[in-house]
């Protein structure tokens, strides 16, 4: 099983492996989950939005912070974060095939199948958010993965992303590789935990256009519609993206009449 598939909670793995549980609404665009899967989605989203209120902190565990400070390497088969940025960037085969580094670059509060990667604890969140060096490294990790997906960050203040020069090749890979959709879920969750919530909305907005308007990333629709929009922490941003989605689908319908 892919590491990223394990990183998602049970509902996401169920979506990945049991597509017959997903039914299309009449317009063919809005995706709906079975009742059981929908409950799992709702519970996980609420845990994330509410900041995992039942999570117990462990002040003795600091591996995520140490990794962000370039003090320890990712494990297994990994490296120090600065080395990853310097030597792995643009090595698409390595970034694709190695399934052990994402849990270190983008830690979240849930445990993963990488037993050598630590879940993110509340005290680490504060330390990473308060440290410019750690923040700069997280932003660089995000830019590296955007490049891997055929994108680049045009504006770090509002999160606007655009296609990179090799977008066609990279989009093709992203469109066909479900585990990369799960990686994006992890990235978005991590950004929201570690001080970069403001980068998420315009990334999602870009993906919606590529799904519904240009149709270059149609296979991302389940993750985007059912999850990514919902893990925007600001209710006004969730509402904005819902309106934007509805407008795109209306434009599609109008173009067919």
Label each residue range with its predicted role:
Residues 1-158, 162:
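N-terminal leader regions that mediate targeting or early regulatory function
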Residues 156-257:
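Alpha-helical bundle/repeat cores within regulatory domains of eukaryotic proteins
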């Amino acid at each position: 099983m892919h590491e990223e598939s394990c990183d998602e909670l049970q509902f996401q793995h169920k979506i990945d492996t049991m597509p017959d549980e997903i039914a299309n609404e009449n317009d063919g665009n809005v995706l709906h989950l079975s009742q059981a899967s929908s409950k799992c989605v709702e519970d996980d989203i609420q845990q994330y939005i509410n900041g995992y209120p039942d999570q117990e902190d462990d002040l003795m565990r600091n591996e995520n912070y140490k990794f962000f400070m370039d003090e320890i390497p990712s494990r297994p088969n990994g490296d120090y974060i600065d080395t990853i940025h310097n030597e792995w960037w643009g090595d698409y085969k390595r970034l694709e095939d190695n399934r052990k580094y994402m849990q270190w670059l983008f830690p979240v509060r849930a445990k993963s199948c990488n037993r050598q990667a630590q879940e993110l604890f509340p005290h680490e969140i504060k330390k990473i958010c308060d440290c410019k060096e750690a923040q700069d490294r997280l932003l660089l990790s995000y830019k590296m993965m955007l490049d891997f997906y055929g994108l680049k960050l045009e504006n770090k203040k509002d999160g606007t992303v655009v296609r990179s020069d090799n977008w066609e090749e990279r989009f093709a890979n992203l469109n066909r590789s479900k585990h990369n959709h799960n990686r994006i879920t992890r990235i978005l969750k991590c950004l929201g935990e570690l001080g970069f919530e403001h980068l998420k909305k315009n990334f999602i907005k870009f993906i919606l256009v590529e799904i519904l308007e240009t149709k270059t990333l149609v296979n991302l629709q389940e993750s985007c519609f059912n999850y990514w929009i919902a893990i925007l922490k600001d209710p006004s941003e969730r509402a904005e993206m819902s309106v934007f989605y509805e407008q795109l689908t209306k434009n599609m319908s109008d173009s067919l009449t």
